[in-house]
Amino acid sequence: MRIDIKDSTMVKPAAETPGGSVWLTNLDLLSPANYHTLSVHFYHHDGSENFFDAAALKEALSRALVDFYPYAGRLKLKDNRLEIDCNGEGVLLVEAESDGALAELGEFAPRPDLNLIPQVDYAKGISTYPLMLFQLTRFKCGGVGLGVANEHHLSDGVAALHFINTWAHLARGVPAPSPPPVFDRRSLSARNPPKPQFSHAEYQPPPTLPTPLTDTAIAYSKLKVTRDQLGALKAKCLAGDPSGKPRSTFEVLAGHIWRCVCAARGLPEDQETKLHIPFDGRAKLRLPPGYFGNAIFFATPVATCGEIESNSLAHAVKRVGDAIARLDEDYLRSSIDFLELQEDISKLAQGAHSFRCPNLWVISWVRLPVYEPDFGWGKAVYMGPWAAPFEGKSYLLPNPDNDGSLFVAITLHTQHMERFEKLFYEI
């Protein structure tokens, strides 16, 4: 399949916007350097003549940037700390065409070889590249892919989707959704003086293998979990838990994935493994509605592979649930203070080294409004990550059919994937 770039436009706010800078919190600064989160929304053609009209989309995007003006800015350093320079330079919108059809993408597994998202040139420095880039790719079947590259220092997925959904509302001629974005980040400032109360294992180096694997080829898989299978997993977990405590869908699936990955990797019983679970702190910290920035913390249970494999599903799920339950307001405030005391927060940034074998990352997009953006021609048939897959990273994704099923998208070493898939369905 071939992708041909037809046009590129730097879209600027439709009206004058505030200047100055947006301060970045310690949580914002945890984002890796030179990194945009990559995802794609796919839409089937609805039969209309003006399907995803580029001019209309640019006009709506320009209007959306009036409220979300920091996206039109650029990164800059001040006193050796990153911030957003609100200079109004704009976001990039690329138009492209493909000689292939959406059906050829099958289950929409990430294809980094297909340029469905604009390439970011990091070589010229942080002040030169856009914080948000979009690509509208038209397929020969009439469908489109909307590729998104979001610079993570400015916003997490919740905030980015707030912006994209606002753009979609304006494109279809309805008022922007409430609430408006809130850029005041003082609610996530460290206390003065900082008072960390915990050791914060989430920011400690992850376990490593004593001898690196020689075969590092990776494979990607997307597995469907039906409503009945979820029910069976929950029942199995409940039957093995003397406390009789019901567990959430996320806790049960994360525990199940952790057990299956540990077994599939075949590591020694005494090998430590760390599970990374991103957690949205907006509710716990009572952040203002519309808070725009990163509010992601981490639950990170650590165990030996032997402990996770040899005990019941209920045990692994309890480890997950206990780690998440620990993230109360006191713990989250302590986390911010802990970061305040670090000389260089960027050294603690999560990345490929954090969740590769023997570790694991499980993130849920199930409650994110990933299927809300409707630009006037219907909702997406699929939305998901499109980056080069990192070994050990997995996503829980909603099913657009809304039938109670979910998808688990995961990347593992090729030598481990077949066994993982077999174990995953042994419910």
Swiss-Prot record:
Which InterPro entries does this UniProt record tie to the protein? CAT-like_dom_sf, Plant_Fungal_Acyltransferase
What is catalysed by this protein?
Answer: (2R)-3-(3,4-dihydroxyphenyl)lactate + (E)-caffeoyl-CoA = (R)-rosmarinate + CoA
Q: What class of enzyme is it?
A: transferase
Annotated catalytic residues: H152, D374
Chain segments carrying region Disordered: 181-208
- Record-annotated disulphide pairs: none
Highest taxon in the source lineage: Eukaryota
- Pfam families named in the record: Transferase (PF02458)
What pH dependence of activity is documented? Answer: Optimum pH is 7.1.
Q: Which GO terms fall under molecular function for this chain's record?
A: rosmarinate synthase activity
Mind listing the UniProt keywords for this protein, alphabetically?
Answer: Acyltransferase, Transferase
What are the thermal characteristics recorded for this entry?
Optimum temperature is 45 degrees Celsius.
Enzyme Commission identifier(s): 2.3.1.140
- Known function: Catalyzes the formation of rosmarinic acid using caffeoyl-CoA and 3.4-dihydroxyphenyllactate as substrates. Can also use 4-coumaroyl-CoA and 4-hydroxyphenyllactate as substrates. Rosmarinic acid is an ester of caffeic acid and 3,4-dihydroxyphenyllactic acid.
Which PANTHER family does UniProt cross-reference here? SHIKIMATE O-HYDROXYCINNAMOYLTRANSFERASE, TRICHOTHECENE 3-O-ACETYLTRANSFERASE
Which family, according to the similarity comment? Belongs to the plant acyltransferase family.
Q: Can you name this protein?
A: Rosmarinate synthase
Organism annotation = Melissa officinalis (Lemon balm)
